[in-house]
Regions:
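Acceptor-substrate binding/catalytic loop of class I
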Residues: 185-202
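Class I SAM-dependent methyltransferase SAM/SAH-binding core
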Residues: 61-122
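A conserved beta-strand element that flanks and buttresses the S-adenosyl-L-methionine
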Residues: 134
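Short catalytic micro-motifs in class I SAM-dependent methyltransferases
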Residues: 137-141
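A short glycine-rich, Lys/Arg-flanked "PGG" loop and its adjoining helix->strand segment in the class I
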Residues: 146-161
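Conserved class I S-adenosyl-L-methionine
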Residues: 2-58, 79, 96, 108, 161-186
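A C-terminal cap/extension of S-adenosyl-L-methionine-dependent methyltransferases
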Residues: 216-280
Length: 280
């Protein structure tokens, strides 16, 4: 059982919508006017898996669960849209969709984006509609995470690739226990909704049980989650001296962890996030 599952209750779509609209009201990440240092690094480290694992052809569509990344500055699925592919996003929050839509229009990419207001536990697509399906930090927020794997599988063409990112309970920097602490003091729901944490074996076995082949597990975002939170908090004050000090002090630390992560060693399985790939 993934860590944290006992804390979950079944959520209706309306409850999930209220939760994520509430996150928007409190999140300083969603109100940033420019990417933070770790936003750029997060995006670069995630995109390397698209390059490694996916080869979608022009005319094929990509599916992404939730639109949070595109409503902030990590913008993972821009990788596909900037290469001429259409991306369907499924998100339960009208607010997040509107924020992402404005960003995409400003970036000249909205013609390739197709947001759908829906619950990603029950995808509204015909089977075999997509060449690639992906989710990053999505399915751990719902108890029916196995249903989400099955839904992504069904929506993907035979031979298509499904990529899923989930929090890592084995994270060296104790992401799970940091979330437990934030939950205890009542701060977690202002940043995100409750989330499950997985071991590499759990998410690998879940993909195999869902019928995927060629399953591969890796990790991404090796640097401390606490530095990520600090970076995002400081980004609220881009013109203050604290932001300039952050750039001088944090940049070399993040660069060191990025170099280590790109060496693709077993240390990646201690990263903040696990990423798993399976082929339908």
């Amino acid at each position: 059982m993934p860590y944290g599952e006992r804390d979950f209750t079944r959520s209706t779509g309306a409850e999930m919508r209220r939760q994520w609209d509430n996150v928007f009201e409190h999140s300083f990440h969603l109100r940033q006017t420019a990417p933070a240092l770790t936003d750029r690094t997060y995006r670069s480290l995630a995109e390397r898996f698209f390059l490694k694992w996916t080869k979608p052809r022009l005319g094929e569509w990509v599916l992404k669960l939730d639109i949070y990344n595109e409503s902030t500055w990590t913008k993972y699925a821009y990788y596909f849209m900037q290469r001429g592919l259409d991306v369907a996003y499924v998100d339960v929050s009208r607010t997040l969709i509107e924020v992402a839509r404005r960003r995409m229009m400003n970036d000249g990419l909205y013609g390739k984006a197709h947001p759908v207001l829906a619950d990603f536990r029950y995808l509204p697509f015909r089977p075999g509609s997509f060449g690639v399906a992906c989710s990053f930090g999505s399915i751990e927020h719902v108890r029916e995470w196995r249903t989400c794997l099955n839904e992504q599988r069904d929506a993907t063409k035979t031979g298509g690739c499904v990529i899923v990112g989930v929090p890592n309970v084995q994270n060296f920097w104790m992401r799970y226990w940091s979330c437990v602490f934030l939950s205890k003091i009542g701060a977690l729901r202002k940043l995100t909704s409750p989330e499950l944490h997985f071991t590499p074996g759990e998410i690998r076995n879940a993909m195999l049980e869902a019928g995927f082949s060629d399953v591969e597990v890796n990790g991404y975002h090796l640097f401390p989650k606490q530095l990520r939170w600090l970076d995002l908090w400081i980004q609220q004050f881009p013109d203050r001296s604290i932001a300039k000090a952050r750039d001088l002090l944090l940049s070399p630390i993040v660069a060191v962890f990025e170099r280590i992560e790109r060496q693709e060693t077993v240390l990646n399985l201690l990263a903040e996030m696990l990423i798993v790939k399976g082929v339908k």
